[in-house]
Swiss-Prot record:
<dbReference type="InterPro" id="IPR029063">
    <property type="entry name" value="SAM-dependent_MTases_sf"/>
</dbReference>
<dbReference type="Pfam" id="PF01135">
    <property type="entry name" value="PCMT"/>
</dbReference>
<comment type="function">
    <text>Catalyzes the methyl esterification of L-isoaspartyl residues in peptides and proteins that result from spontaneous decomposition of normal L-aspartyl and L-asparaginyl residues. It plays a role in the repair and/or degradation of damaged proteins.</text>
</comment>
<dbReference type="GO" id="GO:0005737">
    <property type="term" value="C:cytoplasm"/>
</dbReference>
<keyword id="KW-0808">Transferase</keyword>
<dbReference type="InterPro" id="IPR000682">
    <property type="entry name" value="PCMT"/>
</dbReference>
<dbReference type="GO" id="GO:0032259">
    <property type="term" value="P:methylation"/>
</dbReference>
<keyword id="KW-0949">S-adenosyl-L-methionine</keyword>
<dbReference type="GO" id="GO:0030091">
    <property type="term" value="P:protein repair"/>
</dbReference>
<dbReference type="GO" id="GO:0036211">
    <property type="term" value="P:protein modification process"/>
</dbReference>
<keyword id="KW-0489">Methyltransferase</keyword>
<keyword id="KW-0963">Cytoplasm</keyword>
<feature type="compositionally biased region" description="Low complexity">
    <location>
        <begin position="76"/>
        <end position="91"/>
    </location>
</feature>
<feature type="compositionally biased region" description="Low complexity">
    <location>
        <begin position="33"/>
        <end position="51"/>
    </location>
</feature>
<feature type="compositionally biased region" description="Basic and acidic residues">
    <location>
        <begin position="14"/>
        <end position="29"/>
    </location>
</feature>
<dbReference type="GO" id="GO:0004719">
    <property type="term" value="F:protein-L-isoaspartate (D-aspartate) O-methyltransferase activity"/>
</dbReference>
<comment type="similarity">
    <text>Belongs to the methyltransferase superfamily. L-isoaspartyl/D-aspartyl protein methyltransferase family.</text>
</comment>
Length: 322
């Protein structure tokens, strides 16, 4: 029997006065970790408020101490000074909102802001559009609501955009120019539009004229225009599905007619539906394939005056319906 075991049975008084055992093994490691954790806590108290929060240390069994671990911070939302304050009920935390902005939402808000449309209007004014009613109408109508979502970011650029069925929405500068020519500073009572398309130009016209009649020959575009205009609750637009070259004799005469497609000439039926003193604006194609924005004024029951203005490019004016 070893000397150690010999000391245990029986136990003498001096054997009972043993020194406390020194921490060994994992208990020592725990105590060392606890000391390190306390040092980190002390350092964190002196660090700026932006440091990661520390999880308080927990006592382990048998007197040991578990090491305190830094709380894992969200990668997309680093803490900022004052971020520990609770955000208002129902809202996002300020740190989350600033560190990880929703790009798509920001883009949508930018598109719908008045500032974006105002920049477009400033470009129109710089390009010569002067009628305040036309500029106000262009500023008020949200063009991005009339194009495909994938093209919404380009809605306020001065560009024609596809709307399907081999048709396009005209450039803002062309829309403003045609409406300004048709109005000529007058108070418009009744206006006819040939080629509704997606409904954007009709929406702008509705803010310049008392009543707007618009004809579309492509049935899916006619339905789309109705859907696009519905959220705007425009009460003075009357959409018609039919042949634009025929016009709307039942609603004539019109103070102004705006044709959003190019033919080799202006249909006679539309000239007849123009009121005396009325103005018709249309792109007219030439044999060489070029198109010219043309203004026609009815000066007498059987007399019209024609003026050729700007070079333009429009989809062709066709007969019938599809």
């Amino acid at each position: 029997m070893s000397g150690e075991r010999a000391k245990r049975f029986p136990l003498a008084l001096e054997d009972l006065k043993r020194e406390p055992r020194k921490p060994e093994g994992r208990v020592a490691e725990r105590q060392a970790a606890g000391d390190a954790a306390r040092q980190r806590l002390t350092a964190a108290a002196a660090a700026p408020a932006a440091a990661s929060p520390i999880v308080p240390e927990r006592r382990a069994p048998h007197g040991g101490v578990f090491a305190a671990k830094p709380a894992r911070a969200k990668q997309h939302a680093p803490a900022a000074p004052g971020a520990a304050k609770r955000a208002p009920q129902g809202g996002a935390k300020q740190g989350d909102r600033s560190a990880a902005p929703n790009v798509a939402l920001s883009g949508a808000l930018a598109l719908t802001s008045e500032r974006v449309r105002e920049r477009m209007v400033e470009r129109l004014r710089a390009n010569g559009v002067a009628d305040p009613r036309v500029l106000a109408a262009m500023s008020a109508v949200p063009r991005h609501m009339f194009v495909d979502p994938g093209l919404a970011a380009q809605a306020y650029e001065d560009a024609a955009l596809p709307i399907g069925h081999q048709q396009t929405i005209s450039k803002p500068s062309v829309v403003a120019r045609m409406i300004e020519l048709a109005a000529a500073g007058r108070a418009l009572e009744r206006v006819l539009e040939i080629g509704t398309g997606c409904g954007y130009q009709a929406a702008v016209l509705s803010r310049v004229a008392r009543d707007v009649y618009s004809i579309e020959r492509v049935k899916p575009l006619y339905e789309r225009a109705k859907l696009n205009l519905r959220p705007l609750r425009v009460p003075n637009i009357r959409l018609h599905y039919g042949d634009g070259r025929v016009g709307l004799p039942a609603a004539a005469p019109f103070d102004a007619i705006v044709i959003a497609a190019a033919g080799l000439d202006v249909p006679r039926a539309l000239l007849e539906q123009l009121a005396i003193g009325g103005r018709l604006v249309a792109p007219v194609g030439e044999q060489a394939g070029e198109q010219v924005l043309t203004l026609v004024e009815r000066v007498a029951p059987a007399q019209w005056r024609e003026s050729r203005l700007d070079r333009v490019f429009f989809v062709p004016l066709k007969s019938g319906v599809i």
